[in-house]
Amino acid sequence: MNKDQKQLRIGIVAGELSGDILGEGLIKALKKHFPDAIFEGIAGPKMQAQGCNTLYDMDELSVMGLVEVLGRLPRLLKIRKQLVQHFIDNPPDVFIGIDAPDFNLRVEKPLKDAGIKTVQYVSPSVWAWREKRIHTISAATNLVLALLPFEKEFYDKHQVPCTFVGHTLADDIALEHDDSKARKELGLSPDDKVLALLPGSRGSEVGLLSETYIKTAVQLQAQNPALKIVVPLVNAKRKAQFTEILNATAPTLKISLLDGQSKQAMQAADAILLASGTATLEGMLYKKPMVVGYKIKPLSYWIFKTLFTFNIKYFSLPNLLADEELVPEFLQSECNVANLTQALTPMLNTDNQALKARFLAIHKKIRLNASEQAANAVAELINAN
């Protein structure tokens, strides 16, 4: 009897908000294959709204930073042990770990050893550093679902089963869009020249980057006094932190601080100065010229450089996807006012059509309807003998 014809149990774990969003789309798509499937594991509100039963509060897994993780370690280990035992006692037809690889791979390994099919949705950055983790991933999973094409190439090289499903952000953002609506929402006119500053979402990023970003904005506004500068800040705490640095650095700078609204700020901008991470992908999908400037604490940087080998030429996603430097990147001491100003000036004074065409081509390459692709791959794994 085909497994499509019986009620399935699908174990699924998301560790943070981004995973909950991916999980919501995946559950919706899996229901088309298995309308009566039971979903249970660790879910946020979006997955729960799709009918997923959560055995633990997802917030318990959303821990950032070494010190914070150590403080919560006994509880995390207890959850992991109980979760593994639950799924061994009540075997699902498949277990899907969404991102959170440090937690999920350690759940997947004992389940796979017990004969349960396992999937890791979102690859760890194993292609960039700590490459030996590929052996851990291979031992823990039957299938990896990769969001980016170069990730699949890496897994293929190591003969680890992997399906490239595309990126949900590329599905959510239109290939072409009208920026006038975003400008109107932010009180900007169609003729304004606009620079967006995105100094990160974490306190450490805002603390390390804001002064350099603000001083760069001062230089650019001196070149063009009509330049409008917008800064979306993720919450009230980050806004207060940025305001304090702004008042100490350039209290007379003409600048608009926004509550969230990062999507509108990106869409409205002629150019963006931003920290690394998913925001660089989002900026590319909005077809915006950008400069990436990033710093971490000198001691942390030294530890990373000393202990780990990095296998990448670039650290921003647009450049990794293009395998060339489409976006200027400045790290640590190179992330300075002179470099950032020099890189941004031409972006604010030309139409950047060739760059935007490259961004559009990459957008098309990763816009595959990721949730449907992921569900198809999971269904194929479930139905395989």
Curated annotation (Swiss-Prot):
One of its GO terms (cellular component) is membrane. GO terms for biological process: lipid A biosynthetic process. GO terms for molecular function: lipid-A-disaccharide synthase activity; phospholipid binding. Pathway: Bacterial outer membrane biogenesis; LPS lipid A biosynthesis. It catalyses: a lipid X + a UDP-2-N,3-O-bis[(3R)-3-hydroxyacyl]-alpha-D-glucosamine = a lipid A disaccharide + UDP + H(+). Its EC number is 2.4.1.182. Disulfide bonds: none annotated. The keyword Lipid metabolism applies. It comes from the Bacteria. InterPro entries: Glyco_trans_19. Keywords: Glycosyltransferase, Lipid A biosynthesis, Lipid biosynthesis, Lipid metabolism, Transferase. Belongs to the LpxB family. PANTHER family: LIPID-A-DISACCHARIDE SYNTHASE (PTHR30372), LIPID-A-DISACCHARIDE SYNTHASE, MITOCHONDRIAL-RELATED (PTHR30372:SF4). Condensation of UDP-2,3-diacylglucosamine and 2,3-diacylglucosamine-1-phosphate to form lipid A disaccharide, a precursor of lipid A, a phosphorylated glycolipid that anchors the lipopolysaccharide to the outer membrane of the cell. This is Lipid-A-disaccharide synthase.
